[in-house]
Amino acid sequence: MSPTTQGTLVLIVTLLMLVSGIPVAFGLGAIAIAFLVLFQGFDALHVVAETFWSGLDEFTLVAIPMFVMMGAAIGSSPAGKDLYEALDRWLYRLPGGLVISNLGACAIFAALTGSSPACCAAIGKMGIPEMRRRGYPDDVATGSICAGGTLGILIPPSITFILYGIATETSIGRLFIAGVLPGLMLTGLFILWTVFIIWKRGFRSHAIDFRYSWKEKFQSIPKIAPFIFIIVGVMYALYGGVATPSEAAGVGAALCLFLAILIYRLWKVQQIWLILRDTMRESVMILTIIATAVLFGYMLTSLYLTQTLAQAIADLHANKWMLMFLINIFLLVCGFFIPPAAIILMTSPILLPIITAAGFDPVWFGVILTINMEIGLIHPPVGLNIYIVNAIAPDVPLAKVMWGTLPYVVCMMLAIVILCFFPEIATWLPNHLMGVAIGPK
């Protein structure tokens, strides 16, 4: 059987697995084992355990449970409420000030958790009811939280960048630094759209009828101080060359756990157990997907499917920007149906040779890939953030939540276009801080 026929068969079976509802981790592993046995015989089984183990035998992977613990500790505390209230006291007089406060809180929270669902849930629980109380339209209130939550996988530390770095052997430190400016740019685009739509609709918040005193404003600063301390501590450890990403993640996890226990007084055994349980549950899920995705990638390589696809694309002699356009469309469609972790681990090893052959920077592409994953988080049918927000505000029709996210999807697409025209937005900072790198690390 030719590699093209084998590849078509693998594609069909994989798509059937994804739409069937089978957990991605188990589905990828089963498909990999089945096709290895089918085309290479039972002798191929001896590499399954070895490949599964080697997929997890990386010190870098320690960063994943550590960053997950950061999100679990902060998410279990009233930290999101404090952060949101502090920003609101300073920004409430601006047009759309409450939405801007939410987006700013999402950006800061993203720098603490690296998780989109955690960011969306923590800020949304306080932000959505308050925006609706002050008269903001439901589509703006829910759509802005959905979009702001996606910043959790772009603004470092980002679990998405860790997965991409592992899958493509790209420096995770460079990826983290590369996500800073695009993350701030995307936050700015979200804010600009919010101000524009509020101005166009002539909306006047109920908040205009009252004022916070300067005393109340300055009293809110200590609520933000612990977040800034943790962010600066982790970033200094990471970008100052003091620690590796895994070590910096450990520092961040310890600081967030101390914040939850000492400041927010989550010192009961049951409360700490819930944090550890959530950390273990999400970490095991991600690590299992990584291990089976490595096995899936081994199957693709051993059957020469990856090489055949790369050669077929190279034979097209397409313009590199047309190639990038097609890759973005492919990733966008994948994001509609497949969770981000699975997309990254399944597609990155296949796409990276194509990207580097076309002359694109793998770090820059990691940022482009992540923004595509952000779109998938607020677009049905997967659209995890949509369902989180709908659970927070169940009386808002799901269709209205979806319509509210569409302008922010356009903002993300615009961000991708801007990064294509000005790749230095993603590459300048890592090149400036770490020196110019060529290809994977």
Predicted regions and their residues:
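Alpha-helical transmembrane segments of multi-pass membrane transport proteins
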Residues: 1-441
